[in-house]
Amino acid sequence: MRVVILGSAAGGGLPQWNCRCPICTLARSEPDRVRPRTQSSIAVSADGSDWLLINASPDIRQQLFDNPQMHPREGLRHSPIRAVLLTNGDVDHVAGLLTLREGQPYTLYGTRGILDSVNANRVFDVMAEGVVARQPIGMDQRFEPLPGLSVTLFPVPGKVPLWLEDETMEIGAETETTVGALIEAGGRRLAYIPGCARVTDGLRARIAGVDALLFDGTVLHDDDMIRAGVGTKTGWRMGHVPMRGANGSIDALAAVEIGRRVFVHINNTNPVLVEGSPERVDVEAAGWTVAHDGLSLSL
């Protein structure tokens, strides 16, 4: 199995377009210390030829350009992207669908709840019916988006997308609006969980024994944005478990048998983004890799 992290940042990317926090400032002025990053997306392949795109970020055109294995290879219209899977309906995971509209056939997969949110917005009708098939997938329903590559979706604690929040919103609920994906090919297993509000016993059992885990690395501490002075929301309020602190993911997953551990979906205020920082050193000493755009894994 081949995995390419196309985009490793959370919503807005790094640097965010209007942010002058210290980390965004370093990303502009000293990219050797803080690598710029695009928004959350990965691609997975069983054969290195046909690819499953998981989440379509607003930066998808640039991401595909930056990775030659994703370029058209034949005829006047072609893409090695054969299927797209959504793990939630967040803007940074669905806005890129508007770019993937140029008459290219593929199948769009997601839970019924996630696809319903897409179907309810007519702007996504630019993905022409009859060209892009929309296929709802049930929880724990194993399916093959590509030959030799199987995927099973499972609920993780989360919340509805920001643009669907109302007075009934529940943070930490396990529904089909936020899911993880267990991906298998050639006897190897990858768990991809870019959004997770807390680590539960059920989640630990689900991912035990995987060869690699790509996990929600949005915030280091629950109050990262407050500490940086750029926002008032906690990680919990946004539906993201912190790396460190009470119930932090590093400690919560420490005893779980996992091959490679990689943090993805990293917010611009997270100090682990700074190369060589004490926070980065601490996370790496705990056995985790901080993802960057273009990071590839062969499993």
Swiss-Prot record:
PANTHER family: COENZYME PQQ SYNTHESIS PROTEIN B (PTHR42663:SF7), HYDROLASE C777.06C-RELATED-RELATED (PTHR42663)
One Pfam family here: Lactamase_B_2
InterPro entries: Metallo-B-lactamas (IPR001279), PQQ_synth_PqqB (IPR011842), RibonucZ/Hydroxyglut_hydro (IPR036866)
Family to which the UniProt record says this protein belongs: Belongs to the PqqB family.
Gene Ontology biological process terms in this record: pyrroloquinoline quinone biosynthetic process
Function (record text): May be involved in the transport of PQQ or its precursor to the periplasm.
UniProt keywords, alphabetically: PQQ biosynthesis, Transport
Annotated gene: pqqB
Protein name: Coenzyme PQQ synthesis protein B
Pathway(s) annotated for this protein in UniProt: Cofactor biosynthesis; pyrroloquinoline quinone biosynthesis
Coiled coil ranges: none
